[in-house]
Amino acid sequence: MVWLPRVPCVAAVILLLTVLSPPMALVRDSRPWFLEYCKSECHFYNGTQRVRLLERYFYNLEENLRFDSDVGEFHAVTELGRPDAENWNSQPEFLEQKRAEVDTVCRHNYEISDKFLVRRRVEPTVTVYPTKTQPLEHHNLLVCSVSDFYPGNIEVRWFRNGKEEKTGIVSTGLVRNGDWTFQTLVMLETVPQSGEVYTCQVEHPSLTDPVTVEWKAQSTSAQNKMLSGVGGFVLGLLFLGAGLFIYFRNQKGQSGLQPTGLLS
């Protein structure tokens, strides 16, 4: 194996190794066969009270070398990274530079991005609905949709009649919207009974108090009665509006009439 010494993690490096057997090989296939890249991560705990720098080197999607500021030196993850680890660990000045990047890079960038990233808060929108409109006492999936929030750390819990549900919960995990907001679905598998109240509770840094949204299990007859009541109310409003319209129109017509014999 030929070892090619690499530079520190300052940019992604693409190595194109092409075997040229026939003269036109490069023309037919010039895709990159081997990819080497580096990924720098700054981990913050309680603001900048504790900061950890993690610098990871990959070759063809496999990590082979890393620098961990908690350790203070390079560590070979695979044999491929051992020559570089030994080379860089033998350079005291270079190691001191890497250790100092906890302050010169991580804490420095934290202070710059503090206002528009660290302190940014967007409140979540929470809705609750069942996936099926079938009668009660049948298996159903209640969905708590939490969308458009930032930052991503969020806690979603389900309650039934005030008691937290620990089992039957499925989540999509955190989904990035691509606009600096997140969304997630937290679902509860259950068999709703008449009169039960299900509550989705959401806690997020943007909220001073948890947000709770309820879903009440109702029988078909109760739903029909409610719909009939709503329909009757809407119908009553329509008749009231029509009556008022006719009344005011007649009043306007009468005020416009003039007694006969008067000159204008």
Swiss-Prot record:
The organism encoding this protein is Mus musculus
Q: Residue ranges, Cytoplasmic compartment?
A: 247-264
Q: Where is this region: Beta-2?
A: 122-225
Q: What Pfam families does this protein's entry cite?
A: C1-set, MHC_II_beta
Does the entry annotate any disulfide bonds, and if so which pairs? Answer: C38-C106, C144-C200
Q: What is the lineage of its organism?
A: Eukaryota, Metazoa, Chordata, Craniata, Vertebrata
Its placement in the membrane is given as: Single-pass type I membrane protein
TM annotation in the entry:
226-246
InterPro entries with a match to the protein in the record: Ig-like_dom (IPR007110), Ig-like_dom_sf (IPR036179), Ig-like_fold (IPR013783), Ig/MHC_CS (IPR003006), Ig_C1-set (IPR003597), MHC/Immunoglobulin (IPR050160), MHC_I/II-like_Ag-recog (IPR011162), MHC_II_a/b_N (IPR014745)
Give the matching PANTHER family.
Answer: HLA CLASS II HISTOCOMPATIBILITY ANTIGEN, DRB1 BETA CHAIN, MHC CLASS II-RELATED
Q: Where in the cell is it found?
A: Membrane
Ordered alphabetically, the record's keywords are: Adaptive immunity, Disulfide bond, Glycoprotein, Immunity, Membrane, MHC II, Signal, Transmembrane, Transmembrane helix, Ubl conjugation
Q: Which family does it belong to?
A: Belongs to the MHC class II family.
Instruction: Name all Ig-like C1-type domain ranges.
Output: 124-214
Matching entries from Gene3D superfamilies are given as:
Class II Histocompatibility Antigen, M Beta Chain, Chain B, domain 1, Immunoglobulins
Signal peptide (from-to): 1-26
Provide the residue span(s) of the region labelled Beta-1. 27-121
Question: Per its record, how is this protein called by name?
Answer: H-2 class II histocompatibility antigen, E-B beta chain
GO BP annotation list: adaptive immune response; antigen processing and presentation of exogenous peptide antigen via MHC class II
* Positions in the Extracellular compartment: 27-225
**Maturation and modification:** Ubiquitinated in immature dendritic cells leading to down-regulation of MHC class II.
Q: Carbohydrate attachment sites? A: N46
Q: Name one GO cellular component term.
A: MHC class II protein complex
Claim: Acetylation is one of the keywords in the record: no
